């Protein structure tokens, strides 16, 4: 059996389990925020061979329908300070933050400090495998302060991060 068929089986099993998890958590409404950094507003248009052709808004609507027992919010900014402000704003009241800081992942000590300053756990996600790209993308200031890291699985990375909070 090749790796791609094993991955498909694994993703199907994750989807099945995620539906069970969503059902079990229907009694408690969790608050999970997805925060996207620079250029992620261009998903669906920007480098579709790397990031896919679906917009994040389309994907987010699907997540909301699939996980009705979770209060999902979405925020995107191309501005570092606005991302920090959002982390500060929700970082003491939400159950989890799913953060794709985009290129700020590799440059922003300030975002890492904001994550350390709040109590809400943060999961770092990336659509592409940053380690298979340019060498400057191999360093993350977010990973050392995040609960975990999921990357390289396309938009599914966000759903897997969401499942980990349930």
Label every PLM stretch briefly.
Residues 108-117:
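Short Gly/Thr/Asp-enriched flexible loops that form oxyanion-binding sites at enzyme active sites
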Residues 29-32:
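Extreme N-terminal starter segment of soluble prokaryotic enzymes
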Residues 117-132:
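Short, acidic/small-residue loops that bind anionic groups at enzyme active sites
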Residues 73-81:
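Short beta->alpha junction loops
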Residues 43-57:
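Glycine- and acidic-residue-enriched helix-capping/strand-helix junction motifs
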Residues 90-97:
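Short acidic/histidine-rich motifs immediately flanking catalytic phosphotransfer sites
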Residues 132-166:
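Short, glycine-/small-residue-rich phosphate/pyrophosphate-handling segment
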